[in-house]
């Protein structure tokens, strides 16, 4: 393609905004007029040659066929495109008929827009073009804008023509028009940095992604292929992918059909994308409007290639109702089959949804659900998706994010991740990564993941574009691709100051990213003693303790008088508000309800009764104390529920490392059950205390102890290691009483570039720092 011609077109169109719109729109709004007008003019030029044929078809259907509604298909056939216009107008005839009367032009313009087929009318509506035209007519610039777009000095038609001076203007192909339109979008996005990152990925990042996706299959690219972007924005990923294939890997001796698919939620960017498809001759019906997460528009389709830069750090809370019912995932795209530590797979599937504040990994799972199975020698599917750092490590073992990473790695889909330089994007300076997925890895990559750190590979821009202050040069992309394609490990290089430079690459086994998360328990040791001070807080309900304590201190026993608290309700709620105690209506009602206070006092009365029976002696053996309480309850007429009994016991007991262990229960195991337990834990009977089973001296009899929640800890054990061996090496030497809670084990997965690529930079010697200070003082 001759980009010099295209760049001249871009410059001319860009100048229209400054010439005609400067005093009518603020600079950031120029795009609202220029982009839809470019689309309109291109469609207009495409339809001009078939105008009479379309009007004749309209006449035929209305007069000969007596059609009440026009039939789309013959009109499309008459126009030669998937769109048409049944009005008598073109932009040139609109201009010719208008003279200087803006109102006549506005009226005719609306008639012209209403004559388009529904697919173009949808674009007009999404662009809000009628409103812009009305505004320009009011400001007396509509005629000027139309005149600029039909100027003989630019050629937006698919035929060669001459300008006003007789110079030849080359034809503008669909591919060339796509380039012009994309370049305009890029320039507007760079001008409007506030919104740029929402739907615009820097050109060189897309170029790297297309190389990563298509280069490994350059000799296997099918003649018919599908490309999908679930967050397509203005369509840059899709059209750049198409351009890349057509320019770099054209089909030899055959034609190649590339079908582009996408979905976009923003009206304007959807209109831009759909326009771009129409301009380039792609099927605009393949671009859908709406939320990718809420509705699975392409549920029955599978795609060859997928590229995307989904929004990161953006909440999906408003879409949860379409994905989950309570805690249950109802959308199959976001469920995965994973085995637990014992090898059991939940038939319902495991949750693969991230925290509601960041939905980026949902877009990745949407693409994974659209991968083609590599059967009968087919290529399968390849995905390139841009994400921020939280996608690599956020989320605990067993959580949605971790499950997603684990699923991709266990199923050997993750081929590589490339870390990009900071400040490469227009609206964020954070670190970003390209995830490369492949469900048909070549043999030498199977079971492996390549991590490439290209964060130090960039050249500085002379002028910042929003947050963007650097870019990839062609040689940087070539270096990344060479490292990736050759599947090489590359050591990090340091400059003379010890700072990292260049590129680094490491290759890992899939298991290197997995870990077991296991809970380590320690026994609860408690002392207990009844006292008036300890049971006094039982007067107050835990959920309202602070407010109730204030009321009791202020009014004493009057709080139990019927209606008293209600009379003083305003002063009580005012105090709560002043002291930042938030009360909803239900809590307020409880707080001022005498019956609620009386009910709470019954627990205190029960504790006082037990104190009289058990006494106020201190117990260093909680087991003995509990037996005494149970005996007292049995001997008395007190009827306490389990929560009420526990509330009293917890109020008068506390952890003390010198006290006896609190027994949970005594377990009796038959020989068969004991053998099953030993097989389950892969240990000897003598090792059972390390799993919480302590022998009692009788064959098959073990005691288990209550664990202390305050002393409970968790350990992350690499997937390649034995949990028990890790416990023996790293935990037991320091905490002799600890045991493993094997029922708690969850499998997690995380990827840490910092851990793998960090190079320690030694501190400078004091002498060197001192000398530098002396030198600076001399200069001053």
Protein language model features and the residues they cover:
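Conserved catalytic motifs of ABC-family nucleotide-binding domains
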Residues: 312-315, 319-357
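Hydrophobic alpha-helix feature that most strongly marks membrane-spanning transmembrane helices
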Residues: 246, 278, 282, 311, ...
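Conserved Class I SAM-dependent methyltransferase catalytic core
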Residues: 29-42, 287, 343-437
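Short acidic (Asp/Glu) and glycine-rich catalytic loops that position anionic groups and cofactors
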Residues: 189, 253, 283-287, 340-346, ...
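Flexible, glycine-/basic-rich loop-and-beta segments that form/coincide
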Residues: 426-534
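Conserved S-adenosyl-L-methionine
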Residues: 199-308, 312-328, 388-390, 397-404, ...
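Feature representing long, continuous alpha-helical segments
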Residues: 239, 271, 308-310, 361-365, ...
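Non-catalytic, mostly N-terminal accessory regions of nucleic-acid modification and defense proteins
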Residues: 1-217, 286-297, 419-422, 446-453, ...
